[in-house]
């Protein structure tokens, strides 16, 4: 017998026979529901289990309706076969079966109460569709507008609105905040309701006598026909009973004898409208077109948009019964015990990982578990903050309270026990908590065997930072024992097995811990070092003395307090803790003394020195080999095992020693003669003198940029730059600091780089302002009741951003139930006395302290971009506002701007020609006007705040298996191993989907990378195939002699091309533009739902998708995506970012390809005008835009304007690139052709006018009529720029050389001297 394939992840086909559905009508397929196939063939892997297949089947269109079922081997049509163990791997199940015998039957089985509850919950989930859950941590989470953008016509049809116009360029979209959501997506989609209501019946639980007859639960369902169905769920399935709301009769209904093993089928038979609407819901067009928009976000928290559509709140009786459906508990004693999160995490980490299948299973379990733990933490923090959970130590100060809820250990991220008092108090504790999470994540990614880490989540909620951890086994028992020992003998007891206890006074070591942590220290590039305790005894440690090793009662070794997993930034300690700030004279003190370096900097510095060491050693090795044996001089192998570069984790760190009056602060590790301590200073200086300088230089060279604070943070962190250096970067970005940039880059910079640096500097200063605003708002929100949060946020936003509309905003309390006398006496809070002037001063002070920078005078009043600042502040604070255009200008000024907009010039960037967006028609109202609302006196009101959601930072480790597999496939493909590279990349995508799920940020990035790879090589293969076809065609049409010569000359070349064209079948099947588009579309949807609708990465995905649609000739879709990109540009930065020039140019090119020359010309003009305004008239960027604009003018028939613009381009190319540059020569050739054509056209016009003046009027009329069509094309070329240009479609797809040849005319034609010269040159050639 044949066995399943032996490859680790090989797939084989399994055939399943599903049970019938007798209650469904025969025409169910015509209604839209899929028919139950007689057999279902499923592709599975040999390491999957039937339990995995069960999950897949329950989620499939063919098996969603199944209730309780089991897998059996086929026996006969009337008799069930033997049961199959569902936890056994499929390779074991079918080990002795031939491929055609891999068959299983799916048979209905008796229900138990758990399976009934799960079946009901599955029905509720399917019927609710995209209905929002009021119990979720945010509103409108996981929203996507991708389908509304690309299928705007369908959305308009469903909303009974006029179809939007064909995409084109009509000027910038309206500059409003509401464009985060396209106009069509702002209206809630109305999905069909299948039932009016569904709930567990009030007759639950079944009486004991009926439970003995198999009754499990009772349901009450209100159908669309107006009937109330009372349903009994029994061990044999579901049936209609004879009960009513007043009378209990659980036996089958006498006149409605309906029974089914599936509740879906029972309702379809009992309610025709349920069947009809369920078919509509099942075939929802949006989820059909974009499958990823309807999938649940499972292994990560969905993105919460800062402008949220507040859903309509509907009655759902089963919403409060969900807890029973999930747990089955009706009393406290029947409630299942809380999950032991720590045991689950540690046991999951200890799963075997020796084989590929085991690693895949382990990564999948870990990511799912971390996602559930993170969600539980996000739900518990608001409850703890609201006082719903009693503290474990109620006698202590509130800041020191500890909470234990559902086995989650919750504490505030503050200095509650004065541990950080000498380092900055709460400010230092706030930083330490974040760094501890970073250390846990970093160590988790290292995945060191034998080392256990607590599950850790950091949550920012209403101005407070909270830490949620799993419970270390035996922690509280050890703490109690230590406290008792301390009271009995007065000594300081400790349960710490490794590391220091509140500093270096007491240090413990343990050989077992030392062995495990030495592996961690080596991976972290941390040097083993010696520290002295209070008695002067030396202890050798692998990590910082602050890191603590504890033994749990479960026998595992746990590592805690890993905040100082990187060394201190000694340069910052020496120069920036006190003193004057940059670009100012005021002095300020940095908030804390815990400035740590980033791990990315440590890794980059270590790699740089490793490469230098390897290069030097290789050079010496080659020189030595040359002297001894020339034949071995080319060896490239070098041994780097003797390379050593490690960093002292406690170098220059400050510790408090002693207690009471004897307490003092010491720095025990400052001897820079020790290499590991000296390395700490060197890497700190490397950050300031090279890394930051290189960042600014790369920005000036156009190698990197940032569109908003999120992108800026990612760019800085990727290079290892802390955000405290924002002020230093802003100062270094000034033109006056150019001498401090990388001179090897500066020497190659041309005119226009100033615009790139200034745009970057603006983003940097904006980020400082928004971060300081976040710190100030945190102060006001901290310890504020939830009911006052919206009023506080609205008043703060008015003082921060709404002063132009209302210079003196007055706080407004929300309308709530009148407060009691006690609460009224405490009604005056600090936020209520906030004024704009006070806030400006607080922001300036905070920027001085945290970023060592003096904010430019009047920056907040004149240069702050308020829509972008509002967006950034909401994202940093977890604030969700109602969807509307927030007006920051006075009402009169705004009305004046709105009235002036229709008469503005459409080609200028400073105005807007569209009343809704860049694609709306003038003079036509495409959507109903918004409902009238009372006039506002301020920009924000408390009712604008829809939700405040917790901001979650998690320690979830990444799956190295997925990343390694994709990278291995990519490298193999590039090296020429096409088939194995393709298979590895496809396999890695499957790994990503299994480990992270289909809707996850990491999966979306994988889709995007693979789409770009597919697009690049699919285009390359297509070009090679076209060249080969062209070569074959030319070869076939040439003479015999030419054919022989060509073959002799290019035999080697031709053999290589032939080899490249012989691609494996899997490569031909996968590497297509259609597949590239499919994966990129998936990447866009996943990015919107997991990162955010306006995340910089989402905008990049839209740009890539537009480019791929353009290359596939889907120009309308490409233009729709480009319109979305323009909207995102306005939201993230504004209309004048340097990269917008390229976006406008791309739009113009797409319109030109579609032969829409007039809007294409306007887009080119907009791009050129923006380039002149940003880069100046002499920049190479301006020259490129002028060159493109001149070609658009040629296609529009405006030759005179084309000559003027091309003269500008040629002058710039001549000055910047020189006369020998190909671009200069191309511009010169085009300009010469245009000039010759203009001269010839002028002479011909002059000749015609001279002939007509000498002819009688009647003859002129006859001649003009006879030759009207003959001269029509020539008249179009003669029209000057003041006339309306006419397009020349014949020139649309021609190259520059073709254009020049067309304009100059065929050699030998024409009577001018220039024509005769061209004819002579043509003959000589």
UniProtKB/Swiss-Prot annotation:
One of its GO terms (cellular component) is cytoplasm. Residues 1276-1285 have a biased composition (Low complexity). The keyword Cytoplasm applies. Residues 893-937, 1032-1063, 1245-1325 are annotated as: Disordered. Its main location: cytoplasm. InterPro entries: CLU-central (IPR033646), CLU_dom (IPR025697), CLU_N (IPR028275), CLU_prot (IPR027523), GSKIP_dom_sf (IPR023231), TPR-like_helical_dom_sf (IPR011990). Keywords: Cytoplasm. Residues 311-573 form the Clu domain. GO terms for molecular function: mRNA binding. It comes from the Eukaryota. Residues 1265-1275, 1314-1325 have a biased composition (Basic residues). mRNA-binding protein involved in proper cytoplasmic distribution of mitochondria. Belongs to the CLU family. PANTHER family: CLUSTERED MITOCHONDRIA PROTEIN HOMOLOG, EUKARYOTIC TRANSLATION INITIATION FACTOR 3 SUBUNIT EIF-3. May associate with the eukaryotic translation initiation factor 3 (eIF-3) complex. This is Clustered mitochondria protein homolog. It comes from Malassezia globosa (strain ATCC MYA-4612 / CBS 7966) (Dandruff-associated fungus). The gene is CLU1.
């Amino acid at each position: 017998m044949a066995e399943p394939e032996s490859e680790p992840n090989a797939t084989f086909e399994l055939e399943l026979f599903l049970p019938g559905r007798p209650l469904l009508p025969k025409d169910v397929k015509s209604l839209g529901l899929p028919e139950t196939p007689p057999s279902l063939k499923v592709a599975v892997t040999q390491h999957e289990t039937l339990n995995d297949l069960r999950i897949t089947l329950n989620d499939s269109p063919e098996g969603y309706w199944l209730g309780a079922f089991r897998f059996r081997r086929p026996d006969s049509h009337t008799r069930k076969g033997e049961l199959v163990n569902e936890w056994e791997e499929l390779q074991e199940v079918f080990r002795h079966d031939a491929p055609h015998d891999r068959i299983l039957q799916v048979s209905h089985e008796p229900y138990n109460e758990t399976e009934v509850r799960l079946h009901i919950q599955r029905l509720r989930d399917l019927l609710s569709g995209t209905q929002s859950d009021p119990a979720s941590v945010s509103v409108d989470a996981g929203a996507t507008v991708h389908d509304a953008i690309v299928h705007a016509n369908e959305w308009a049809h469903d909303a009974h609105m006029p179809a939007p116009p064909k995409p084109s360029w009509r000027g910038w979209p309206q500059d409003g905040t509401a464009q985060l959501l396209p106009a069509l997506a702002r209206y809630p989609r109305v999905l069909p309701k299948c039932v009016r209501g569904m709930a567990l019946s009030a007759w639950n639980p079944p009486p004991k006598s009926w439970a003995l007859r198999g009754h499990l639960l009772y349901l009450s369902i209100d159908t669309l026909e107006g009937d109330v169905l009372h349903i009994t769920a029994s061990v044999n399935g579901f049936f209609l009973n004879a009960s009513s709301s007043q009378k209990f009769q659980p036996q089958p209904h006498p006149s409605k004898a309906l029974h089914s093993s599936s509740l879906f089928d029972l309702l379809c038979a009992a309610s025709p409208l349920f069947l009809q609407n369920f078919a509509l819901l099942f075939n929802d067009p949006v989820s059909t077109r974009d499958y990823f928009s309807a999938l649940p976000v499972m292994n990560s928290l969905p993105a919460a948009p800062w402008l949220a559509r507040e859903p309509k709140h509907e009655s759902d009786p089963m919403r409060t019964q969900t807890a029973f459906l999930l747990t089955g508990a009706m009393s406290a004693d029947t409630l299942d015990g809380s999950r032991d999160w720590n045991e689950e995490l540690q046991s999951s980490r200890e799963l075997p990982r020796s084989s590929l299948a085991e690693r895949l299973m382990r990564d999948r379990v870990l990511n799912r578990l971390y996602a559930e733990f993170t969600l539980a933490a996000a739900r518990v923090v608001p409850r703890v903050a609201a006082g719903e959970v009693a503290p474990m130590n109620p006698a202590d100060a509130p800041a020191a309270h500890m909470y234990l809820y559902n086995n989650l250990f919750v504490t505030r991220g503050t200095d509650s026990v004065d541990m950080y008092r000498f380092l900055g108090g709460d400010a230092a504790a706030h930083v330490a908590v974040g760094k501890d999470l970073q250390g846990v994540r970093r160590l988790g990614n290292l995945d060191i065997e034998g080392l256990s880490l607590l599950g850790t989540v950091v949550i920012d909620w209403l101005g407070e930072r909270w830490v949620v951890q799993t419970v270390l086994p035996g922690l509280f028992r050890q703490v109690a024992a230590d406290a008792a020992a301390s009271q009995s003998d007065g000594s300081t007891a400790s349960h710490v097995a490794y590391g220091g206890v509140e500093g270096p006074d007491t240090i413990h070591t343990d050989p077992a811990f030392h062995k495990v942590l030495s592996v961690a220290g080596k991976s972290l590039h941390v040097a083993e070092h010696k520290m002295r305790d209070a008695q002067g005894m030396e202890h050798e440690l692998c990590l910082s003395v602050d890191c603590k090793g504890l033994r749990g009662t479960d026998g595992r070794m746990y590592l805690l307090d890993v905040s100082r997993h990187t060394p201190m930034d000694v340069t910052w300690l020496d120069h920036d803790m006190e003193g004057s700030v940059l670009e100012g004279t005021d002095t300020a003190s940095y908030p804390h003394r815990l400035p740590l370096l980033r791990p990315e900097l440590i890794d980059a510095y270590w790699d740089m020195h490793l490469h230098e060491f390897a290069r030097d050693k290789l050079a010496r090795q080659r020189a030595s080999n040359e002297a001894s044996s020339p034949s071995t001089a080319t060896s490239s192998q070098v041994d780097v095992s003797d390379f050593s570069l490690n960093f002292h984790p406690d170098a220059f760190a400050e510790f408090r020693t002693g207690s009471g009056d004897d307490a003092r602060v010491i720095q025990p590790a400052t001897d820079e003669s020790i290499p590991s301590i000296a390395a700490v200073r060197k890497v700190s200086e490397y950050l300031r003198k090279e890394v930051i300088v290189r960042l600014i230089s790369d920005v000036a060279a156009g190698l990197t940029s940032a569109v908003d604070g999120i992108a800026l943070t990612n760019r800085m962190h990727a290079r290892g730059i802390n955000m405290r250096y924002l002020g230093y970067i802003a100062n270094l970005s000034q033109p006056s600091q150019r001498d401090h940039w990388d001179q090897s880059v500066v020497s190659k910079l041309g005119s226009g780089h100033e615009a790139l640096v200034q745009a970057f500097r603006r983003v940097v200063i904006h980020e400082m302002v928004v971060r300081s605003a976040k710190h100030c708002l945190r102060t006001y929100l901290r310890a504020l009741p939830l009911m006052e949060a919206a009023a506080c946020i609205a008043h703060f936003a008015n003082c921060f951003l709404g002063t132009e509309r209302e210079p003196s905003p007055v706080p407004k309390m929300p309308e709530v139930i009148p407060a009691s006398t006690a609460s009224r006496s405490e009604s005056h809070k600090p936020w209520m006395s906030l004024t704009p002037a006070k806030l400006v001063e607080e922001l300036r002070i905070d920027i001085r302290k945290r970023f060592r920078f003096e904010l430019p005078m009047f920056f907040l009043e004149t240069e702050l971009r308020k829509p972008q600042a509002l967006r950034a502040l909401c994202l940093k604070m977890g604030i969700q506002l109602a969807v509307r255009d927030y007006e920051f200008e006075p009402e009169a000024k705004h009305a004046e701007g709105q009235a002036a907009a229709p008469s503005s010039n459409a080609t200028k960037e400073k105005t807007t020609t569209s009343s809704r967006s860049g694609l709306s028609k003038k003079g036509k109202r495409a959507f109903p006007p918004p409902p009238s609302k009372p006039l506002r006196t301020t920009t924000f009101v408390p009712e604008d705040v829809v939700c405040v959601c917790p901001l979650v930072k998690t320690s979830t480790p990444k799956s190295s298996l997925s990343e390694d597999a994709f990278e291995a496939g990519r490298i193999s493909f590039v090296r020429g191993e096409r088939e194995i590279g393709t298979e590895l990349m496809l396999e890695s995508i499957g790994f990503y989907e299994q480990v992270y799920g289909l809707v996850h940020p990491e999966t979306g990035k994988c889709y995007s990378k693979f789409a770009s790879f597919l697009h690049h090589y699919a285009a390359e293969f297509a070009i090679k195939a076209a060249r080969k076809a062209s070569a074959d065609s030319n070869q076939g049409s040439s003479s015999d002699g030419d054919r022989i010569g060509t073959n002799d000359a290019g035999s080697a070349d031709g053999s290589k091309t032939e080899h490249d064209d012989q691609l494996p079948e899997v490569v031909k099947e996968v590497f297509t533009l259609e597949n590239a588009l499919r994966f990129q579309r998936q990447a866009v949807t996943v990015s919107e739902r997991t990162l955010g609708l306006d995340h910089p990465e989402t905008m990049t995905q839209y740009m890539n998708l537009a480019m791929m649609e353009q290359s596939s000739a889907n120009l309308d879709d490409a233009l729709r995506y480009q319109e979305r990109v323009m909207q995102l540009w306005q939201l993230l930065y504004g209309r004048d970012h340097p990269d917008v020039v390229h976006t406008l140019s791309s739009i113009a090119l797409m319109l030109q390809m579609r032969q829409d020359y007039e809007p294409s010309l306007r887009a080119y003009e907009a791009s050129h005008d923006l380039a002149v305004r940003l880069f100046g008239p002499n920049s190479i960027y301006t020259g490129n835009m002028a060159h493109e604009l001149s070609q658009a003018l040629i296609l529009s028939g405006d030759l005179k304007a084309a000559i003027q613009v091309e003269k500008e381009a040629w002058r710039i190319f001549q000055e910047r690139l020189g006369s020998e540059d190909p671009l200069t020569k191309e511009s010169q050739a085009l300009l010469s052709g245009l000039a010759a054509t203009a001269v010839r056209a002028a002479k011909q016009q002059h000749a015609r006018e001279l002939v007509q003046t000498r002819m009688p009027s009647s003859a002129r009329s006859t001649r003009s009529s006879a030759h009207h069509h003959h001269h029509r094309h020539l008249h179009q070329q003669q029209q000057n720029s003041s006339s309306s240009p006419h397009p020349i479609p014949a020139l649309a797809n021609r190259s520059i050389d073709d254009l020049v040849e067309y304009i100059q005319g065929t050699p030998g034609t024409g009577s001018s001297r220039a024509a005769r010269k061209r004819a002579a040159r043509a003959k000589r050639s």
